[in-house]
Structure formats: structure tokens, C-alpha cells
Amino acid sequence: MSPRSTLRSPLPSRTARSSASSDTPSPGADRQDRMSKAKELFVLCDKEGKGFITKRDMQRLQQELPLSPEQLESVFESLDRDRNGYLTPLEFHTGLGELVGSGPEEKVRSAGEIVGEEREEPTEIRFTQILMELGADKLFKDQWELCGLWCELQRDKPELLGVLEEVLSYTVSHLQDALKEKDNLEHALRRREEDHDRVVRSMYEDMESQLKEERERRQALDSMRQGDKKEQLLHELRTREQELEFTLTKQRELESRINSLSSDQADARGENRRLQNVNQQLQDQLEQSREELQNSLSQLQQLQNTIKLQQRGKEREVLKVSRNMQKERESLVRQLELLRDMNKRLRDDKDAHQAQKMVSQKHSFTPPTYYPACRCVHNFSPWPRSIYPY
């Protein structure tokens, strides 16, 4: 028997169920068997546990079924009625049941039974339509349990299908509200991120402005200091020049007096001793003046050397100030890089928090309203299994 024939589990119509003999399998057993086989195939395709399968996942059945990749691709396209590129569990189960078709025992049924079965809407298709009407066909990751519960209620307790629809509607409403709240939170986070970027940009502009103002202030201060020192040195230089000029004038006057006394020496031999004493005094004064002149020249030389040293110190100071400004600029650039790194880490933390929050919200929903237990005289419970989808 081929794997395709092992997957054939038809949905009996009302006519077939009413005319079936006691030795044939019950419709519930056939449906459960078909659902279990479809689920096994779906799990074989969805090895990552995504909750849906793609065309590439469908091609993994090549090792399980005697079908070529082209045939598997054709099967996937026939099942993908929405043309969205993937199949949910219910779409796979319902489409696979229709694609596999009836077994050999159903081929001999009468034409009237076949027409009656075609008119009947399969339970799984009806369940899929209800999920699509509620907008929940893409909300639930695993829909096998819900489909099984729906089929059992359809078979055993059709009057409870309305209750299950209300529970599904209530659950879908809360899930949609949660998704809207998540969208609002994401919008708020994006707005906060934009505000943060704007604040960082403003801080960067303020730092640039402060750096420019500090640079201009230091340049103005250095110019003022250089101007004041230059004026002071020029004033001292003019003072020393005046003193030197006065000393030279005094020296010339003394020399003139010496010449005058020398010319009068012949006429005043009697006053020779006195003139010699005066001459000696004048010579002493001349020597003192020369010493003062020498001292003045030495002081002038020292002033010139001091001016040169100060000029070199100014150059070194200007170089030092420029180096300090370069170091300060590098420090500000490093601070800016730190701010950018902090901003990147904040974005990464926000993305991780959003991903964790999306995962936690995907596996949580508001529990449905509990209904009282059935008080009828039946021996079995109206709630054969949990109605939760997970």
C-alpha cells in the first residue's frame, strides 16, 4: 500500500453515517485518524516549529512520499488557496483531506450519496471559515486541538458549538486588543527614541558651540596678554634709551670741560695743583660715568636677551596652548563616541526588550469565561478536553 493510500481518511456524509453497518469504523475514529496523520505530516514539514509551512518545507516529504519535487510543489500550490506562500495547520489539514479524496470503498457509492456529500460542508472547512470570520486564522500557532474539539462537539454536542464560538470570539477580541496595545507601545518607544536622538543632537551642538566660544575667548586673552607685555617692554626700552642718551650727553659735557681746562693749563700754571685735583675728580667722575655706561649697556644687553627669551617663551606657550586645545578636542571627541556607544546599547536593549515582550505576549492570552458543568443525565462530560488552544 502506498503512503498516499494510508493518508486517505474520508469525511462520511450524513447519508453514509446513517446507513453504515456496525462493523465499519465510526466517523469520529476516522476523523481522529485523519487528523493525527495530517498532523504527523505537518510536523515532518515544520521541523523548526514555526506553526506554518512553506513550499520548501513541503519538499521535505519527498523522502516520506513517492512524489517528485514538482508534484510536491503542485500539491502545495493547490493547498495554498490564499496564495500567501505558507500554510497553517487547518489549511494543510482541510486541503489535504480534499486533495487525497475518498478511499476505494467510497468509489462504489451511489450517485445520490455522492451528490448529498458534496452538498454537505465538511466540519473542518466550517471551522476554518469561522476562524477567518473572527480574524483568528493567523493568531493561533497550533490549531489542532481547537479543530479536534470542534469536530467532537459537532459530532457529540452540536448545541455547544455556539458556546465555543463565543469563547473563540472573546479570546480573539482580547488577543487583538493585546496586539493593538503592543503597537501603541512600539509607537511610544519609537517616539521616545526620536526624542532621545533629538536631545543627543542638541547636546552635541551645544558642545560644539561651547568649544568654539572657549577657543575664541582664549585667542582673545592671549592676544591681550601679548599686547600688554609688548607695551611694557617697549616702555622699559624707551626709558633705558633716555637714560643712555642722558649719560652720553653728560659724558660729552665732561669731555668738553676737560678740553677747556687743558687749554687753560698754560695760562694757569699757578693753579696747576688745583686743576690737577679737579682733573682727578673729573677723571673719577668720568670713570664712574663709564662704569655707569657699561652697566647701562650690560643692562640693555640683558634686556635684549630677556626680550628674546620671552619671545621664545611666548612661542612655546602658544605651542603648549595649541597642544592643550588639541588634547581637549580629542577628549571631547572621545566623549562624543562614548555617547554614541551608549545610544547604541540603549537601542540594543530596547530591541531585546521588545523581542522578549513579543515572545511573552505570543504565548499569553486572557482566559475565557468558565461555564457551569452540564447537569444532564448523560454519563459523559460535555467538556471532553480543554478548550484552550495551547
UniProtKB/Swiss-Prot annotation:
Coiled coil: 173-357
Biased composition (Low complexity): 1-27
Superkingdom of this protein's organism: Eukaryota
Positions of the EF-hand domain: 33-66, 67-102
One Pfam family here: EF-hand_7
Keyword annotations of the record: Calcium, Coiled coil, Metal-binding, Repeat
Chain spans, region Disordered: 1-37, 206-234
Keyword Aminoacyl-tRNA synthetase among record annotations: no
SMART domains: EFh
Keyword Metal-binding on entry: yes
Binding site for Ca(2+): 80, 82, 84, 86, 91
Family, as annotated: Belongs to the EFCAB4 family.
Name of the featured protein: EF-hand calcium-binding domain-containing protein 4A
Source species of the chain: Danio rerio (Zebrafish)
Upper taxonomic lineage: Eukaryota, Metazoa, Chordata, Craniata, Vertebrata
